[in-house]
């Protein structure tokens, strides 16, 4: 009986770690600049992606959407960074950012970012993901003011 208890206890300790190891690390995106004194009429986006598998070429694409009167999100014309090479995976998360500047509007508009992530190994594309901006992500650089993180921006 003691042997069964020890085995059961060992499995409960070891199995969660095995399950967690199989899950891909999370991506995130945030608004880190929203119409500040230093960056008027600007929307800054920052994102992070896992730096695995090692050796993969990492790319991000930043796009902006606006909230329609019926609550849907539609693309903002010409608010697309195109694919940006952000580095080679070395085992640590990689952050990158992109800013967009807009003409002043007579009525406010709510904006958010959508970031697409791509991992490439040679000609293979083993992983692709997408994330909409959300609050609560401290970025390593570029936030105005420092530490700013939001899901949306009203311009």
What does each of the following model-derived ranges do?
Residues 2-7, 11, 16-155:
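Low-complexity, Ser/Thr/Pro-rich intrinsically disordered linker/stalk segments at domain junctions
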